[in-house]
Amino acid sequence: MKQAFLLFLILLSVSFTETEKIEFKQDVSTIHGIKVGLPEEPILDLIIKNNRPVLSTKTQSFEWGGKRWTNVKRIKNKKIVAKNLPEDAGELLSMVNFNDKIVAGCSNGLYIQEARNIWNRILPSDKNYSWSPKNVAALTIDTKGNLWIGAEQGVGRFNGETWKLFTGNEGLPYNHFTSAAAGLNGIVWFGTEKGAIRVENDYFYYRFSRRWLPDDHVNDLVVDESGTVWIGTNKGLGQIDSKEITFEEKAFFFTKQTEDRHNRMGFIAPNELKEPYNKASYQLGISDNDGMYTSMYGAAQSFRYAVNGDKEAKKLANRSLKACKWLVDITHESGFPARVIIPIDYREPVNEIYSREYNKRNQRSDPFWKDIYPRFPTSEDGKYLWKCDTSSDELAGHYFFYGIYYDLVAETDEEKEMVKEVVRDITDHLIRNGFLLRDHDGKSTRWGNFSPEFCNSIWGWDQRGLNSMMMLSFLNVATHVTGDPKYEETAEMLREKYNYHINAMHAKEFFPPENVVPWDNNLSLMSLYGLINYEQDPELLLMYRESLEYAWLNISKQKNAFWNAIYGGLCQKFSQDVELGIFNSEFVFPENELYAPFKSELFSNWDARSEDILETLERIPLDLIGYEMDNTHRLDIQIDETPGQKKGMGWRNDSYAVPVDERGHVRLDRDGFALLYREVGGGKSEQEGTFYLLPYYMSLYHNLIQK
């Protein structure tokens, strides 16, 4: 797998222009086990011999031949001996030669040998800390000649004159060390009882969980001449390479990944892995939100087409549009979008799985679960099953995509008419049925009710802001795409009679915690994108811009590149409107002549944090399997102590989310502050590359990052 990936990168490197070759490091993990010749034993020791890693278990040694491990003559386990250490030094844990002197790490201290029988205790200190180190289990010398220690108190670097000490406050994630090794260009790797840590330019990269290693308990590690680190654990060997790659090469990789393993009849969705963690064992899967996921992929390809003029991008955007339209055309009533379409002979008996008994079981724990059967009705032609009980998630995705497609991709009359037709059908369905999705049982779907009656009831009060805003957004998209004035007239009625625009100013619940679900951030921001982009009334634009800011203040530190891109794109438009002078207080809220100028100036100052977009795009792993990652043990985090907050929520000491490659999120609608998380499907599912593609191309389109 690793060799195939490296060949893929080589082929990519000759396919892009020089302006596209701004490179960054992409970490890639390979797990070695019985398939490549290793026994199922703990890997205890590692050395580099002739630039090849050689490992030892308790009874055997193996050398890497490039494709397989070969049993070789037993290499004795490394033993360290330091004579005449002070009696109170405790157990000798590590040892290294520093400037021609032996440095010994012990359970009770750090020592340097000044003469044959003379050991002096080292007490590291800098401007922040003064240590008497304990359990100094890791020592190494980097390529610049610095001494590094890993101790109970943290990590230290000594240049021969001064110390620099690192704890959780400086970003050190963990401190139960087992080993250390020097890499290239001053890089240092530490092994711990919970993963491996790379220190590069005083920044700590934490590599733990099955995403990076076969097991978290690292016994030993070593770095070869290319900078590859080989990591011995209790359950096999891990290998991590840092390879140079460009953003465009990464986009090409994820487009291919999505097309190869996630395209089912034009629908994009997570797949299923018959063998856990083995992407080659995939089979195409379905989700509850095929329409939303296909829409988001189509939006990514639309932005790609706008940025690059790539013919493939237009082809994929068109295919996505046709797939989304098919979801709408196949159902019982015009304009009702299905969640999923599958062949009548699909491998799973879905209506037996989603039986009446299934519904009753769900209602015991969820009183709002809808009892509808069949959940997969048969299409009129008898060839397909389609999933009902469609949610607001689907509609948010559909309308988000349709507006973007219409603006950036639709060029021919046929393309324009196709998107006009599907927007008209869905919007007319909502209006005709009292602003709700009416299912085949004649009732509203569980999550598809945008009616005034629902929004102003005990059942919908917590969704009032979001659903009111979404309905106005749908109508704005419909007005823009179709040009039919009836949709603006309908929106005006909802505003004047039911205050939907006032509700929209608080479009997302962020407290109490029990009302907070992260995917509503997607619904909110995707709908605000259509609402604000197509709104013509300056007073409403000011109100909706305030709603956007409220949402942003609650999510801005989660390092979600997609959310940053939406916020940045909408703020750009607002600032342009301010420059055009459309918020003239003579006409905009004239009852308070100070309000419009004040809000215009306030909301013209914005920061979508392009640095967070770039960091996240760089660090999104190429492996999108849903590994469980538990960060609650880290030294560099703070737990969210908000009353009512569920366990396992928090952020790093800098108040921002843990980097994306150190948490379990591989979808765009997850909570970046979830320190303990396993993606849906876990190791038995791979997520699609839209996770990278949509924020990347959207950020490029809005000039939030440069190619």
Model-derived regions, located:
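Terminal, non-catalytic domain-edge segments
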Residues: 225, 235-236, 241-261, 524-707
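Extended ligand-binding groove/face enriched in aromatic
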Residues: 271-273, 315-463
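Bacterial Sec-dependent signal peptides at the C-terminal "C-region" and cleavage site
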Residues: 2, 12-22
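Loop/turn residues immediately N-terminal
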Residues: 58-62, 107-111, 152-156, 193-197, ...
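Short coil-to-beta transitions that initiate beta-strands within beta-rich domains
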Residues: 30-49, 73-98, 123-144, 167-184, ...
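Well-ordered alpha-helical scaffold segments within catalytic/enzyme domains
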Residues: 295-310, 382, 397-414, 460, ...
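Long, well-ordered core segments of solenoidal/helical folds
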Residues: 249-276, 317-333, 421-440, 486-507, ...
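Conserved beta-propeller blade signature
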Residues: 52-55, 101-104, 146-149, 187-190, ...
